[in-house]
Amino acid sequence: MISSNDFRTGTTIELDGAVWRVIEFLHVKPGKGSAFVRTKLKAVQSGSVVEKTFRAGEMVPQALLEKTTLQHTYMDSGDYVFMDMSSYEETRLTAAQIGESRKYLTEGMEVNVVSWNERPLEVELPNSVVLTVKETDPGVKGDTATGGTKPAILETGAQVMVPLFISVGEKIKVDTRNDSYLGREN
């Protein structure tokens, strides 16, 4: 159990049989009446966001999440297959369970799989990944006076904006949290 006074961004709680992550919180102490905590909660499984108010000091069950480092090995009839490299145990996840993370997922990539009550909830990617540019328009020299960008499609199908000098076949580093170009890789 965790007190509503101890809520912080990223805290996970159990409500109505689901896991919720606190994405915003505000401790309110009105001049008249008792204090309360106004929160914005995001469902870890579905991604829906709700606003909920708790009394100050109210005890709420804390969701104890387990993180396991697994390696993505292959795809099998729409399922993503991951392997625990210490026990060689396989875990299968659907595209819905992986969500938006699948646009950066490559074979051999190590990811953290977050589980609750032995059920996988989400996949946490590394903060940055190196991918090959599969498709982009050619950059023309003297195209702009200042730096410009163009869309590029990566080997996984993800689309990011890259500088004009990037060409097909180059390896680039991409921030998985905000889909932004970080630089070239050798």
Swiss-Prot record:
Keyword Cytoplasm: yes
Domain of life: Bacteria
Pathway named in the protein's UniProt entry: Protein biosynthesis; polypeptide chain elongation
GO biological process, alphabetically ordered: peptide biosynthetic process
SUPFAM superfamilies found in the cross-reference section: Nucleic acid-binding proteins, Translation proteins SH3-like domain
GO molecular function: translation elongation factor activity
InterPro entries in UniProt: Elong-fact-P_C (IPR015365), NA-bd_OB-fold (IPR012340), Rib_uL2_dom2 (IPR014722), Transl_elong_fac_P/YeiP (IPR020599), Transl_elong_KOW-like (IPR013185), Transl_elong_P/YeiP_cen (IPR001059), Transl_elong_P/YeiP_CS (IPR013852), Transl_elongation_fac_P (IPR011768)
Xref: CDD domains: S1_EF-P_repeat_1 (cd04470), S1_EF-P_repeat_2 (cd05794)
Location in or out of the cell: Cytoplasm
Keywords of the record: Cytoplasm, Elongation factor, Protein biosynthesis
Predominant place of localization: cytoplasm
SMART domains assigned: EFP, Elong-fact-P_C
Pfam families: EFP (PF01132), EFP_N (PF08207), Elong-fact-P_C (PF09285)
CC per GO annotation: cytoplasm
PANTHER family: ELONGATION FACTOR P, ELONGATION FACTOR P (EF-P) FAMILY PROTEIN
Function: Involved in peptide bond synthesis. Stimulates efficient translation and peptide-bond synthesis on native or reconstituted 70S ribosomes in vitro. Probably functions indirectly by altering the affinity of the ribosome for aminoacyl-tRNA, thus increasing their reactivity as acceptors for peptidyl transferase.
Family from the record: Belongs to the elongation factor P family.
Protein name: Elongation factor P
Organism from which the protein derives: Prochlorococcus marinus (strain MIT 9211)
Upper lineage: Bacteria, Bacillati, Cyanobacteriota, Cyanophyceae, Synechococcales
